[in-house]
Amino acid sequence: MAGPAPPVADELPGPAARRLYSRMEASCLELALEGERLCKAGDFKTGVAFFEAAVQVGTEDLKTLSAIYSQLGNAYFYLKEHGRALEYHKHDLLLARTIGDRMGEAKASGNLGNTLKVLGRFDEAAVCCQRHLSIAQEQGDKVGEARALYNIGNVYHAKGKQLSWNAANATQDPGHLPPDVRETLCKASEFYERNLSLVKELGDRAAQGRAYGNLGNTHYLLGNFTEATTFHKERLAIAKEFGDKAAERRAYSNLGNAHVFLGRFDVAAEYYKKTLQLSRQLRDQAVEAQACYSLGNTYTLLQDYERAAEYHLRHLLIAQELADRVGEGRACWSLGNAYVSMGRPAQALTFAKKHLQISQEIGDRHGELTARMNVAQLQLVLGRLTSPAASEKPDLAGYEAQGARPKRTQRLSAETWDLLRLPLEREQNGDSHHSGDWRGPSRDSLPLPVRSRKYQEGPDAERRPREGSHSPLDSADVRVHVPRTSIPRAPSSDEECFFDLLTKFQSSRMDDQRCPLDDGQAGAAEATAAPTLEDRIAQPSMTASPQTEEFFDLIASSQSRRLDDQRASVGSLPGLRITHSNAGHLRGHGEPQEPGDDFFNMLIKYQSSRIDDQRCPPPDVLPRGPTMPDEDFFSLIQRVQAKRMDEQRVDLAGGPEQGAGGPPEPQQQCQPGAS
C-alpha cells in the first residue's frame, strides 16, 4: 500500500525541505501513537485506521516504520484478518534484517510464527519461532527466550491437536495415537517444560500459570489424564492467586474433562458445577451453555437422567437465545437419549424429530442419519410406523451414495422395548490413561456415547468375525458389476480384406506426402542445425541442440537474468521514504543480514514434509456452535464408536421356535455406543 509520493528533498531548498519533512515526521508519529493508544484500549478497528494513515504519510525513520509494521500486524491479528497480519509482519521482518536490528528481527519472527500457526502452516511457523529462539539465545535475552519456547510449544501443540482429532475421526481411540501425532505432542510438552523451567527462574508467576495450563492440555491429548489433572490443579492455584476468573473457569472445565476419562464422574460433576457458577459470574452465556451440556452428559453417565434432562434443557434454552443451531441440535439429541432412559418414548420422539429437522437445516449428514435411526426406532416402539422399510429406504439411499454404510433398522415392538436397556456402570480406573468398562443395570436408553474397554483390546479385535453373529457388510465386501455396453465380436473375413486393402493403398502414399529438400535447402539446414548460443537466446522458438552442456548453458543464461527480479526490494515497503542518509544505511547494513544457507536448508526441510499434505483435500469440517465446548469429549467418543453401531445391536431371529417365546437372547453383550 504505497502512499502519495512526497517531494524529493533535493528538489527543494534546504530549510524548506527540512521543515516539510519535519511536519510529515510529526504527523506520521502522532498518527501511529494515536493508533497504539486505541489498540491498547481495545478499539483495534479504529487503531488500524490510524496506523494505515501513518503509513500513507510515510517516514524516513526506519525504526519508527518497523514499529508501525509490528503494531499493524498485531492489530490485524486480533481482528482475525490473518492475511493482512502476515503481510505486515513480513514487512517488519524484512526491514529489521535490512537495518541489522537483531532484536527486532527476533520479535518479527515470533509474530510471524504465531500468525502462520493460526493459518495452519505449522512447519513454517516452527521455522520462524526457532529463529526467534536462536536470536534470543544469541543476544542473551531470557524473556525473549522464554516467549520463543512458549511459542514453539504452541505450534507443536496446535499441530498435534489437529492431528489427534483427525485420528479420532478415523476411529482412533483417545490416548492411542499414531506415532507421528504422539511425537508432535511430546515435542510440545518438551518445549512447555523448558519454558516452565525458565519462567520459574525469572519468577514470572503469570507465565508459569500459562505453562501449567498448556502442559495439562497436552497430556490430556496424550491420554495421560492423571498428569493432566496435576498440571491443571497448579494452573487453578495460580489463577486464584491472580484473581483471574476466566483462567479459573478454564481450569475447572479442564479438570472435569480429565476426570470423565478417569471414570470419576462424580468428581467431574463438581468441577463442572464450579465452571457453571463462574460462567454466570462472568456473564458469558455461551460458556454457561457449555457447562450445562457437560453436566447433562456427566449425569447421564451417573444414570441420574432427571438431572441430566434438566441441564440439557438449560443448554437448549441458551442455544435458542444465541441462535446456535448446532448447539440446539446437540441438546435435542441429548434430551432424546435422556427421555428414552427414563422410559418416556413419546417425549424422546419429539426431540428426535427436532434433532432431525435441525441436522437437515445445517447440513450435518452424520447427525441426520443418527436422528433418522432414532426416530425410526421410537416410532416402531410406539407402534406408529406400519412399513419402516419402505419409508426409510429412499432416505438411506443417499447416504449409501455418499459412501456411508447403511445401518439396519431393528424390528421392535412394545414387547421388545426392554431390548433397548443398555447396562451402564462406572468403574474407577485409578491412574490409567483411559476409562474402563461401564456396565451395570440401567434404565431404558438409546445407545449412549460411552467408551468401551473391549474396543481397546487390540487392532484386530474389530476384524475378527463372531461365531453365529450376523455382521454387517463392509465396503470391502461389496463389488459393483457394471454391465457392458457392447459385446466384442470377431471381425468377419470381408472386413479383414477391406482393412488389408486400405492399408496397402495408404502405405504407398507415404512418400508422396514427404517434403523433398534440394541441395540448397539441405545446405541451409546443415548451416542452421547447430546455431550458436547467442542465436538461441535471440530466437527462443528454435529447437535446442541435443548436446547436454549447451542445453544447460542455455537454461543458466536465461535464468540468470531473472535473479534480480526475485530479490526483495526495500524501496517497495509501504510508508518508506528513501533519502540520501537512510539509503546509505540500507546499503551498508542490508547485505550482511541476508539469511544464511542453514536457514534456507531448514526451511526446505520443513516445506518438503508438507508435500503429501497438499495432495488430498481436508476432511469435512463438522459444524460447531458457540454453546458447544471446544474439548467436546462426548463427540469424540461418539465418533470413535460410530462405526460399531451394527455390532452393538441385537439381531432378532425370525425362526418359528421363537415365535411363542419371549425376546431372544442376544449373542453379544451390548456395549453403550453412539446413537
Curated annotation (Swiss-Prot):
Cellular-component GO terms for this entry: cytosol; endoplasmic reticulum membrane; Golgi membrane; plasma membrane; protein-containing complex
PTM comment text: Phosphorylation regulates interaction with G(i/o) alpha.
Major subcellular location class: cytoplasm
GoLoco domain residues: 495-517, 548-570, 596-618, 630-652
Start and end residues of each stretch annotated as Interaction with STK11/LKB1: 364-487
Classification via PROSITE patterns: GOLOCO, TPR, TPR_REGION
Residues recorded with modification Omega-N-methylarginine: R421
Modified residues (Phosphoserine): S413, S445, S469, S471, S492, S493, S545, S569
Region (Mediates association with membranes): 1-509
Tissue note: Expressed in intestinal cells.
Domain of life: Eukaryota
A biological-process GO annotation: cell differentiation
Family affiliation: Belongs to the GPSM family.
Protein name in the entry: G-protein-signaling modulator 1
Organism this protein belongs to: Homo sapiens
This protein's encoding gene: GPSM1
